[in-house]
């Protein structure tokens, strides 16, 4: 995609989109491959389909949360009580997103290693992403992020790579 921002995504039907910024910000093939392996993991783990199923499961909980917050707002004469229900719903959706991201990191890392790439490639790419975020001044609170905070992802990836041989890797 003709866009200089660092991004890639997986979509239903086996589609992976890659912004031009990935080419600009990956220092080597292994780092580029780490992003693709992450996106392929979203597809292989059926995250889009599982998210739809989870949304169905959450619909009853969501309805109860909204009814409760409306009742609380009416009985307490505090309209801000509605925000509690909305915050709960958003938190539940983000929780599933973060779980899927962590799973995609883990499965993507395993596939990256099986493909013969340097185990440190994923952590190094996360460092690049974190550096770009800092330069852009983008640091929303972690509870608002769909992706785990980059420093957490860097640590997880580097710890997974610890002790794995870099010899003979791409």
PLM segments and residue spans:
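Catalytic zinc-binding patch centered on the HExxH motif and its immediate surroundings
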Residues: 2-14
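Catalytic Zn2+-binding segment of zinc metalloproteases
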Residues: 40-57
């Amino acid at each position: 995609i003709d866009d200089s921002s660092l991004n890639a995504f997986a979509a239903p039907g086996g589609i992976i989109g890659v912004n031009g910024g990935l080419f600009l910000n990956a220092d080597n093939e292994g780092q580029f491959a780490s992003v693709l392996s992450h996106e392929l993991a979203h597809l292989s783990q059926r995250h889009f389909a599982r998210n739809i199923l989870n949304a169905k499961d959450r619909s009853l909980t969501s309805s109860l949360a909204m009814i409760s917050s409306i009742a609380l707002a009416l009985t307490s004469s505090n309209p801000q009580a509605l925000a509690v229900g909305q915050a709960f719903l958003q938190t539940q959706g983000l929780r599933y997103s973060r779980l899927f991201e962590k799973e995609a990191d883990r499965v993507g890392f395993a596939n990256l290693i099986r493909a013969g790439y340097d185990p440190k490639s994923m952590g190094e790419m996360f460092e690049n992403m974190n550096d770009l975020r800092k330069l852009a001044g983008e640091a929303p609170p972690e509870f608002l992020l769909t992706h785990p905070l980059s420093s957490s992802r860097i640590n997880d990836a580097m710890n997974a790579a610890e002790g794995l041989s870099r010899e003979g890797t791409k």
